[in-house]
Amino acid sequence: TRTSSSAASDVYKRQLIGIGIFMNGAQEILKSRRTIYKFSDKRVDYSELELAFEAADNAPCHKKTYPWKYYVVGRKSREMLLPTVISLCRKKEESKGNVASKQSEARAISKIMDVPVIIAVTTKLTPGDDFREEEDYAATVCSLHNLVLSLWSRGIGSQWSTGGITRHQSTYKNLGISETKERIIGFVKVGYPESIPGEKKVDARKIVEYL
């Protein structure tokens, strides 16, 4: 009937409006995201992490390999990383012709111990198939970005770190990650922002060509 047809049309219009509102919100989340370097002491609830992991697991993935894995690094596990953190700090200072000070070592330790949440992110390795590994790495980065954006949508900041500690052999050993099966692509540091950088992005017109 005309009445039922009109009602169905109204429902469809409301759905379209809802989708439009959602997409506008998503656009703002994408555009407003910033890398956070200073976190507050506010605790990040694990329920927030679970929502982010759910978003991460819905990333696009060619061939359905789902190569990503996330390790939430607790305090005791972080403490196991500290000898390597200090060693890397000293080597970095030596490469500059300096001697590592107690202050520089303390800063390096703080970057590991004082962050509310640290997540080690890995991608699956496929020995003998470089192209598969390349595709899986790309998929894992998409997954990681889903995680970051999900957190940002709820006011939680993050920083993707690829420092030397993320690639060191001892990190694999201390975190129980197999070097032959997985590659650590970085640590994601997570927490509520103490401050948000006013970072200026490149003009989008400079990164696009229509052929």
PLM region spans:
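Short, electropositive alpha-helical surface patch
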Residues: 171-183
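Small-aliphatic-rich amphipathic alpha-helix that forms the alpha element of a beta-alpha
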Residues: 56, 119, 125-173
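Short, conserved glycine- and acidic-residue-centered signature motifs
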Residues: 4, 45, 136-140
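Single conserved hydrophobic/aromatic residue that forms the stacking wall/gate
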Residues: 1-15
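C-terminal helix-cap and adjacent tail motif
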Residues: 26-35, 180, 184-211
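Short loop segments at secondary-structure junctions
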Residues: 75-77, 124-125, 191-195
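Structural motif
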Residues: 116-120, 186
